[in-house]
Amino acid sequence: MAFQKEFFGLRDVKVDLSAGEGLDFDPSEVELTVYRTGADTDGNTIIKALAAVGGPKTNEALSVLLAFVTLGTDQDEYETRIKILKEIGFSVKEVPMAKDASSGIEAPLENVAALVKPETVYQVIRGVLYTCALFVKYNVEKMQKYIKNKLPALATSYGVPELEEFPTESSALKKLASCIRPGQRITNALYAFLLVEMARPETQQGARALAAMRINGTGMTMVGLFTQAAKNLGATPSDLLEDLCMRSLVDSARRIVRLMVQVSQAETIQARYAVMMSRMLNENYFKAYGLNDNSRISAILVAVNGHFSEDTIEALEGIKVSAEFADLARRIAIALIEKYDNASDGGEGASEIIKSAVRGSSGAFKGSRGKPQGRRQEASGEGDLDSEDDDDQDYSKYA
């Protein structure tokens, strides 16, 4: 097949971690915001701000909530949080919270606010902030699904049933999505809050449960898929890398390797979180690690692994590509299966399942198990940052 001429591997792709390239994570280049509460802040101000999230004053409302959860009136606690962020290496800017966060009659989280009690307000606001932070990574459509299908169960399990009332209306979610974007002050303040939360053992479990750690856009999912595919094919990882990496994917793969090496070399758990979150905290980092090319690698791996387990596609709902590339991915998968089947001469590493699938395919990938869906959606869930249509057309010419 013509597209096989475009395959080449990573053995000649040098990942020189000392070379710079502007891709290394440097926390000092990211300014995190920490909001302070005002001297006259009372419970009514907090509740009004909570109700206003998702409305026209979302930025102001979130600044009030973030100031509240950072305990800005407790000077010792406040200074401890600042110290944690600075020790990781971030630049920190202290900013007063907004004076007026009430959005009048437009209060998207009014139902949540109405259920809050004095003894639950802190946990409810933490849960709201964890949920809002996901808008950096997921688009509105995916957040609607998350809020409808997953948030209620998590909220109940962790004792904050008030979050079951989190709105799913597109207008409120679109407003949140427009405010919580890479490089925005409120976004950096959200992740400053999350980093401190995760640095504390007593809060780590709850933070993860409420999805603060859903950052698998860093490529960790692809690594798991790759390992599974190598095992299924009976291929050595180095050989599979050579077959899998098309010319236009190499830069993206290099970024993944660089990022994972930085994660593995981090000396503390806080620093590891900081590295993984780097693409959330700075617009330039976010675009540099926009791993849309890796969604295509993952689509190929899903096509291979789909021969073995129906769970492959169910566990990877976010990995979806254009119809053109989905077709190409299936043909690449067949080429890989045929190569390793023939190379083993029916011996070790040649699964009978693969043999049967290839014999019955007559050159086409048949069966729906593991088949990537045709509609396009980025692997990491970011909404419409960059169009990928041109890239897909470039790939399809190799079919």
UniProtKB/Swiss-Prot annotation:
The keyword Phosphoprotein applies. Belongs to the novirhabdovirus nucleocapsid protein family. Homomultimerizes to form the nucleocapsid. Binds to viral genomic RNA. It comes from Snakehead rhabdovirus (SHRV). It comes from the Viruses. Encapsidates the genome, protecting it from nucleases. If expressed without protein P it binds non-specifically RNA and therefore can bind it's own mRNA. Interaction with protein P abolishes any non-specific RNA binding, and prevents phosphorylation. The soluble N-P complex encapsidates specifically the genomic RNA, with protein N protecting the genome like a pearl necklace. The encapsidated genomic RNA is termed the nucleocapsid (NC) and serves as template for viral transcription and replication. Protein N binds protein P in the NC through a different interaction, and can be phosphorylated. InterPro entries: Rhabdo_ncap_2. Keywords: Capsid protein, Helical capsid protein, Host cytoplasm, Phosphoprotein, Ribonucleoprotein, RNA-binding, Viral nucleoprotein, Virion. This is Nucleoprotein. Residues 381-393 have a biased composition (Acidic residues). GO terms for cellular component: helical viral capsid; host cell cytoplasm; ribonucleoprotein complex; viral nucleocapsid. It is found in: Virion; Host cytoplasm. Transmembrane segments: none annotated. Residues 361-399 are annotated as: Disordered. One of its GO terms (molecular function) is RNA binding.
